[in-house]
């Protein structure tokens, strides 16, 4: 497989992105959270996402395990309330608490 998204030096395959989004959306649907994730993502940075809606963020982990609590790391998968992928973003290379887009293949 090749990288679907690259965040800093971390290469994520589509299966990694799908797994993180699936976990985040499952928690969103059930109204549950793990260490406050998923939570609303307000897109203060003004990304041009390919899908609309209310956005939510969930960690995507650089060790490729699905997030189950603890430190969320720098990278996030963004999805909407219809379980559509908006994108993958990262704190890596951004100032403060801002995000920048991960590069997509």
Curated annotation (Swiss-Prot):
Keywords carried by this UniProt record: Disulfide bond, Endonuclease, Hydrolase, Lyase, Nuclease
Cysteine disulfide links: 3-11, 7-102
Superkingdom in the source lineage: Eukaryota
Entry EC no(s): 4.6.1.24
The protein's name in its UniProt record: Guanyl-specific ribonuclease Ms
Family, similarity comment: Belongs to the ribonuclease N1/T1 family.
EC class of the enzyme, as a word: lyase
CDD domains associated with the record: fungal_RNase
Reaction it catalyzes: [RNA] containing guanosine + H2O = an [RNA fragment]-3'-guanosine-3'-phosphate + a 5'-hydroxy-ribonucleotide-3'-[RNA fragment]
Keyword Lyase appears in the UniProt entry: yes
Active-site feature positions: 39, 57 (proton acceptor), 91 (proton donor)
Pfam families the UniProt entry points to: Ribonuclease (PF00545)
Gene3D superfamilies: Microbial ribonucleases
This protein's record includes keyword Repeat: no
GO MF terms held by the record: lyase activity; ribonuclease T1 activity; RNA binding; RNA endonuclease activity
């Amino acid at each position: 497989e090749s990288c679907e998204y690259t965040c800093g030096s971390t290469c994520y395959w589509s299966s990694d992105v799908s797994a993180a989004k699936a976990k985040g959306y499952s928690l969103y649907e059930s109204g549950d959270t793990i260490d406050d994730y998923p939570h609303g993502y307000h897109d203060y940075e003004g990304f041009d996402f390919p899908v609309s809606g209310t956005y939510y963020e969930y960690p995507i982990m650089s060790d490729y395990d699905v997030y189950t609590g603890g430190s969320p790391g720098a990278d996030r998968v963004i999805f909407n309330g219809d379980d559509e992928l908006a994108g993958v973003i990262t704190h890596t290379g951004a100032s403060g608490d801002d995000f920048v887009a991960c590069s997509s293949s």
